[in-house]
Amino acid sequence: MFRHHPTRGRRTAGLLAAALATLSAGLTAVAPAHPARADTATLGELAEAKGRYFGSATDNPELPDTQYTQILGSEFSQITVGNTMKWQYTEPSRGRFDYTAAEEIVDLAESNGQSVRGHTLVWHNQLPSWVDDVPAGELLGVMRDHITHEVDHFKGRLIHWDVVNEAFEEDGSRRQSVFQQKIGDSYIAEAFKAARAADPDVKLYYNDYNIEGIGPKSDAVYEMVKSFKAQGIPIDGVGMQAHLIAGQVPASLQENIRRFADLGVDVALTELDIRMTLPRTAAKDAQQATDYGAVVEACLVVSRCVGITVWDYTDKYSWVPSVFPGQGAALPWDEDFAKKPAYHAIAAALNGGSPAPGGNCTATYRVTSQWQGGFTAEITVGNDHTAPITGWTVTWTLSSGQSISHMWNGNLTVNGQDVTVRDVGYNGTLGGNGSTTFGFQGEGVADTPADVTCTPGRPSGTSA
């Protein structure tokens, strides 16, 4: 994974031209983006039907783009202020506050009936230089004053605040920011206390990257949240940024969301994008669509996962290419505002796993090894349509004397000799012409059954 860049980034003209040229050269290999497809509901509406929100970050330089703001205002139920609530914008010199740019975005969201997430009060990046010069004995008071002033200014207008952002290193140790060095471990708790005193109603979040899966960094955040809850420190939620790489969605994402929720806090996926190595191809689009669907499903399974925000919605304004040369195409809309397969995978996942119209799946059974009394087999599940499917069920009949002793990447049910295997959530969404595999170890004589079938979607009332 990677370190989150201090700004959301913007391509230079040269990078943009190069990326467009690369995409143009490889365009025939890219799955159709379906720009004219009429979807029955927006992502925001589909999420609201599930008791969630689906939002986008935005930034002030993008707002004059009328095509951009039309989609921003109609497709999403939530907006995150991407840059202009950060310290360098809101208190550029000590004691002088300026909320003009942030208010422009909040006003726009309110005019569209969208909720707003504040981002972010305390962060080691995008600090004005004067903060570094504050004496150690004064910094806690300065931090409290900054939080109090900004939270009070937007009181009643926001649903969430990212109070502290990215305070941990990859190994789980505390990042040695100016706040950590001059105030110490207590600064995070003190920041939450100050924010709660300024607004008793807004939900207060800790936000970080590379905490989507279980590991040293997420373990450290987990222990901090657990400690805060035990001490009565006012923390309401954890934001998992989810800057991901296609094909590398953490297998423990759903489990990790659930363990934080079990502490009694909400979880939000706050900065979702899934980048790929350019140029785009149909296969890369399919993998990305699968990954977006899997992330959405992981959130939907856990009731306290309250919503998802993409880190802007169009590749035109993605931060990725300016930070990771040769990578990009990370968002559900392309640079021309056409919906990519990822968009339809998100919609399908939010829509309860119903297969896209005309969607179908195939199952190809292959014996991979055999020995006296046993064998292993692999089944490839494929989507033979350009629209994504969410959920699949494969069935077949075991031959006489066969049984299954172990399975991976599938939920197994056996009734007599009848086998039913369903997806396990993370491998349930298949982009257009995408595929996944599961396998098992069997006992008995290996053969290839003639009645292998695949059905897209999930039966009513079931979940991965």
Swiss-Prot record:
Contributes to hydrolysis of hemicellulose, the major component of plant cell-walls. Hydrolyzes xylan to xylose and xylobiose. It comes from the Bacteria. Residues 354-457 form the CBM2 domain. Its EC number is 3.2.1.8. Disulfide bonds: none annotated. This is Endo-1,4-beta-xylanase A. Optimum temperature is 60 degrees Celsius, more than 80% of activity remains after 1 hour at 60 degrees Celsius. Residues 40-349 form the GH10 domain. Keywords: Carbohydrate metabolism, Glycosidase, Hydrolase, Polysaccharide degradation, Signal, Xylan degradation. One of its GO terms (molecular function) is endo-1,4-beta-xylanase activity. The active site is at residues 166, 271. Pathway: Glycan degradation; xylan degradation.
